[in-house]
Amino acid sequence: LKLAALVEGLERMSNAPQSEIDLGAAQLIKTVTGFQPQVTSRALVGKLSSKGAAKGSVADDLRFFRSLALQFETRSALFAGRTDRLHQLALDTNRIAGSPVDEVQLEAALYLHDLGMMFLPESVWLKLEKMSKVERAVLHAHPGFAAGLLERMEGWKGAAEMVQQHHETWDGKGYPAKLDGTEICTGAKIIAIVDAFEAVMLKHGARSHGSSVLRAIAEVNACDKQFAPEWIEPFNAVIRTMLEH
């Protein structure tokens, strides 16, 4: 693993001017994955009339974001397949509700929403007992790392907002800004539900798959103050379809 290089590179990118993001991202991809992407200036892309060039840039970004998500999976054997599970659940939930959230922005946010956890010591993000005020403050800062990176990359404002808000809750007691439920962007509401579902599945991993799914969906439905109520039924419909197949 090249986790130290990844963290160092992300810290540099989070403070870099927008004009240097592309080169920094390409260098980081090569360092972490060994893949050498083609670097395209975003300023140049903005001047090109070819839609293919712009689409290529988006595809390159998504591949980079996905590589970071897969790197996060390596922190625990229990995380294997997590990225694809979250991606499928969130996109299916969005689609069954009529796709109100841009799928590309949602995909980017799903890949990066927990990237900031890489910056936290395991003593914080794996802690089971009550956290100290300092530990809680450290945990509550983690959405800002990936959101800050996305905000500095042209074209990812929507994803940045989703990442920043995915731990906000319907009752206004979430973090980092304690937003009221009506202030939370739609993509963040979806991510909050699928992320919680995955966490409960992980917690009950020793049970059979069917039992774990039922326990997870029961816990999600019981948390009516945590999640946006309008997204519970679409999510339930996705889970029903998953169980039927």
Task: Name these PLM-found stretches.
Residues 5-245:
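Histidine- and acidic-residue-rich, metal-dependent catalytic cores
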